[in-house]
Regions:
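TRNA-recognition modules of translation machinery and tRNA-sensing kinases, especially anticodon-binding
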Residues: 1-168
Length: 168
């Protein structure tokens, strides 16, 4: 909340129409799809871009309301080919995700940096000293830039190359 976000809770299940409208219904491999009793198509939301865009269309009336950010901490479902990392990353997991809307690319980039710094402060308050930020793939969910915060330890399947220059 310190970075001007608003916590909300979005639905675990959404109608498939939102996903069809975005073009991702048939392109995202990890979607859990099912039919309701009436025969309607539904999706267990592995992420909420479709839902939040639909929501923002109804609440943002002018660009003057930007930047606008909502976030949630919620259970996610992804039908991944190979669930990994034991209990940390299975097909069902809890994730904090945030969605922000900006008038300019420059404002988006500045806000992204504010979010990144906020996470670093959270980890410091928790006493986590071995957390590093690494560039990562946007994966099935898409996007242009992504970072992951990883706790350096001997377990897990990722290999990190670290140097004193700060480029990880």
């Amino acid at each position: 909340d310190a970075i001007d976000g608003q916590e909300i809770l979005m639905p675990v299940v959404s109608g498939a129409d939102l996903w069809r409208e975005s073009g991702r219904y048939d392109s995202v491999d990890v979607l859990v799809k099912f039919k309701g009793r009436s025969g309607a198509d539904y999706v267990l939301n592995p992420t909420h871009e479709e839902v939040v865009v639909d929501y923002v269309k109804s609440v943002l009336e002018t660009y003057r309301q930007m930047p606008f950010m909502v976030y949630q901490i919620q259970t996610k479902f992804r039908d991944e080919l190979r669930a990994r990392a034991g209990l940390i990353r299975t097909r069902e997991f809890i994730m904090k995700d945030a969605y922000s809307f900006h008038e300019t690319q420059s404002d988006l980039e500045q806000y992204y940096n504010r979010c990144h710094t906020a996470y670093e402060r959270i980890f410091a308050r928790c006493g986590l000293k071995n957390v590093v930020s690494v560039m990562s793939s946007t994966g099935d969910m898409g996007g242009s830039v992504a970072h992951e915060f990883q706790l350096v330890n001997d377990m897990g399947e990722d290999t990190l190359f670290l140097c004193d220059c700060g480029f990880n």
